[in-house]
Amino acid sequence: EITTRLVGSEMCIRDRCNIPHVSHHTEAISGYCENFAKEHGLRYYRDVAGNVVIYKKASAGYENHDTVILQGHIDMVGAKPNASGHDFLKDIINIDEDALESGYITAVDTTLGADNGIAVAYMLAILDDDTIAHPPLEAVFTVDEEVGLLGASALDTSVLHGRYMINMDSEEEGVFITGCAGGLRSDLMMDTVMDKTENAVFRIITKGLKGGHSGSDIGTGRPSANVITGRVLERIRQTADIRIVSLKGGAVDNAICNYAEAVISCTADYDRISELCAIMTRELREEYAGIDDDILIEAKTADNHAEAASEGDTDRIILCLRQLPYGVISRNACNINMVETSLNPGVMLYENGVFRLGYSIRSSHASAKRELADRIRNMAEYVGGRCEESGDYPSWPHRHNSLLCRMAGQVYNEMYHKDPAFEIIHAGLECGIFAGKMPELDIISYGPDMYDVHTYDERLSIRSAERVYDFTLKLLEKL
């Protein structure tokens, strides 16, 4: 059964949970894929970035069929509770054994990495099974998708010869993705002057938020802990003189931040700061009722012997946190449920005199993406800072005459007696990179049911994973 492959065998998710593989640290998991190819006598290609392509010849009777590319990424987002001591660079991901009985694979207090470990499990299972009917296959394992699609961008696609590509980096069974937004990372940075402060020092903590994926979850209206921190600092500043000692919120720009801390020097006393935090907690819970019900703002005393940003630099930092937009910027005029453009400040950091805001910009329109990037750059220049852009990737345009999508719909209907949904999504997929490099490539993206990806509540439905695997085998048989 695929359940065995997913959870208990050589090719399972558990295997890859034993190999640390957060973004930018994928050498070991690339080696795992390379060794798999060697052990199975399969031709492979590995580039300097760490991308791996494994080739498998067609099964009997499929030698003259068009080649199919199977594709997924091997890096994962590392998210954990703030109190966790888990080190994603060396510690394994521990699967919650009790959750298996309820039908889900999840990890203990960390992200699971089913995004996109499930694609790796599928591809290795297919490559390992010589009983499957399939055309020539090219299994593409890319690195650093979660930090700007860097692996796909670096891959020399001249090593690929497929006509069709099946990307397995989607998170809802029965929903076939046929297009996606483009994206860009933008880091606003500002150097500050720090000196000793004699005022009381407090830690302002924003927690209890759901967080989520800055693409697929941004349309829910979930708040960002980084944005809320800016609101809290502004409220305190209205009643007292404050200076910022440090800020920390979020680890990656493509996740909605669910926890943030601000350490401030302040002329107000603890009781006043604590009262303001309680007031804002009540206000925010009312504002986000039904969206994020457990928001909590709390204050704690901290070491008074600290250096803090100057008053002017503190004002400039708060200005950056308050004035740039957050969340959905625009929606599709014909489909209000479809987000077209968004902005997410996933990373907030102030330490050693340097302030940084890391943004994920997404849009279906290159011009709108550029407009937001320019606004961030303008703000950086206004406060005397600088801006660095990276990870610019194109949108994936919907192909109206896709044979692959038509075939996938037919197979799904035959197997489950209902039609799938076809959608264009706001999240960025590597499909856009491949579509740009290989314009004739016919692409579809799908995957099993996953929930709360990019958070430590991430979980994968085992039953759904089984069905999607069976569907993939049947689709390969038909191509």
PLM features: residue spans?
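Zn-dependent metallopeptidase/amidohydrolase metal-coordination segment
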Residues: 9, 333, 340-353, 360, ...
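Acidic-enriched catalytic cores of C-N bond-cleaving enzymes acting on peptides and small amides
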Residues: 195-199, 218-248, 268-342
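His/Asp/Glu-rich mid-to-C-terminal helical/loop segments that flank catalytic regions of hydrolases
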Residues: 222-239, 268-270, 315-322, 330, ...
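Active-site metal-coordination/substrate-binding segment of hydrolases
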Residues: 62-163, 189, 198-199, 311-315, ...
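A non-catalytic alpha/beta surface segment that caps or lines the substrate-entry region
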Residues: 22-66, 423
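A short beta-alpha structural unit
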Residues: 18, 250-252, 262-263, 296-308, ...
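Single conserved hydrophobic/aromatic residue that forms the stacking wall/gate
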Residues: 1-8, 13
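Fold-level recognition of mixed alpha/beta catalytic cores in primary-metabolism enzymes, strongest
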Residues: 134-225, 233, 237
